[in-house]
Amino acid sequence: MSDSNTGTVKWFNEDKGFGFLTQDNGGADVFVHFRAIASEGFKTLDEGQKVTFEVEQGPKGLQASNVIAL
C-alpha cells in the first residue's frame, strides 16, 4: 500500500505538527505528521497545497509518509 499518490492538504496545524491530506484518487483522507514531510528546516504544509505522498497503515488508520510539496 505504499504506492505514490498525489493530493491536496486539507488542513495542517503547524503548532501541533499534524493534519490531513485529501487524495486525488478519491480515497479516504490521510493523516500526516510533520516528521513525514520530506524537506529541510521547519516542516509545515499549507492548506490547499498540492503534494505527493505514500500511504501506510498506521496504528489509528491511514497515514502519509515521504510527503513532498509540489
Curated annotation (Swiss-Prot):
Sorted alphabetically, which Gene3D superfamilies does this protein's record hold? 6.20.370.130, Nucleic acid-binding proteins
Matching InterPro entries: Cold_shock_CspA, Cold_shock_domain, CSD, CSD_CS, CSP_DNA-bd, NA-bd_OB-fold
Entry's transmembrane regions: none
- What protein does this entry describe? Cold shock-like protein CspA
Where does the record say this protein resides?
Cytoplasm
User: Entry's PROSITE patterns?
Assistant: CSD_1, CSD_2
One term under GO cellular component: cytosol
Q: What induces it?
A: By cold shock.
Q: Name one GO molecular function term.
A: DNA binding
Residues in CSD domain copies: 7-67
Q: SUPFAM superfamilies under this entry? A: Nucleic acid-binding proteins (SSF50249)
Q: What is its main location?
A: cytoplasm
One Pfam family of this chain: CSD
Q: Keywords in UniProt for this one?
A: Activator, Cytoplasm, DNA-binding, Stress response, Transcription, Transcription regulation
